[in-house]
């Protein structure tokens, strides 16, 4: 089964990395069994280090991986003799990295990280002679073992175009998988117009050129899946938990598919810079509200708001756009999100927002999301060209097409009309 995913490391000027997963086969049952034992030992080593960090209070007294190596390397080698020295170092690197990530994200309120699956990070000391069909792995007790993997057509293209880098290996459902990483050089950014993008709940994206994306069928299906999830959680039986796991996978895949459709629709436009709001802390800042009880102010959770907000793939839209845009010579930038939906993009006195309508101070009725998108792009580039978001004039795509219009026709239509004024109904 083919499983490909793409990830971006560093800023846009740094090389991008494409990761491709393929099935891995060992030459004999003995080597396969031994390598599985190695992965289990590496998992136990990770969990041992994680529990050790908890005892020494790593949360408040951090150690670098070099400090951990100098203090606990001999102890770990003696406790896990099956692991070679480089495997121990990789386990230390992974454990320290995960702990630092947890501390940066949740500070003190996180449980001790525990590794449940079999996987290991490889480097040049743990593998060699990587070709488009074989790889030699270090297997304790067997030295270097030549293993083969399935070279899918897309993987063959990556080998022909790009240089492979480090690999990872993991074990899932009785099968070894090899993750091969390729360095992708960025295309030089092309100077051009900027497009402001406002993300929302019902309207997934609204743009400063008078267009937007809303898929009512997708929203309906998402509400249905959420209702089924609540029903299954209430039953709390073994079969309901199994069904719930399958339902979560379905919801995740459909959301991911919708995100890719939205991003492809955005990239089909004739803009080279996409401006988004920096919503990295939006859930923390809006998850609670202050009310007055008996003359005292009290913070309470906004449960309904949080449940609806958790259904929106805000970060996934940004991440997907950030790795696809540089491949086309385009870029993604973020701006401060404060007051983008409350201020008038024409620099007039502050108006009033009522649902999807924005009542400007001069009596003009604007589309609230369109006004926010204009504020976003003007905050990054004040001389940007925007289309006046008059209420009722926005052109939305992504709805179920009653005329049988295909997705390709829709992209072509948007691409040809994106350079024309879209402010008129």
Q: What is each of the regions a protein language model found here?
A:
Residues 67-172, 307, 311:
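Acidic carboxylate diad motif detector
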Residues 42, 91-99, 225, 244-251:
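Short amphipathic alpha-helical coiled-coil/interface segments
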Residues 15-22, 26, 33, 173-425:
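Positively charged, helix-rich recognition surfaces that bind polyanionic ligands
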Residues 50-53, 57, 99, 103-106, ...:
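A generic secondary-structure signal for well-formed alpha-helical elements
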Residues 45, 49, 87-102, 370-380, ...:
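Stable alpha-helical structural segments in soluble proteins, enriched in small hydrophobic residues
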Residues 2-3, 113, 121, 385:
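Short, low-complexity interaction segments enriched in Ser/Thr/Pro/Gly
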Residues 2-93:
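Gly/serine-rich nucleotide phosphate-binding loop at the start of the catalytic core
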Residues 4-6, 116-117, 389:
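N-terminal cationic leader/targeting segments used for protein routing and processing
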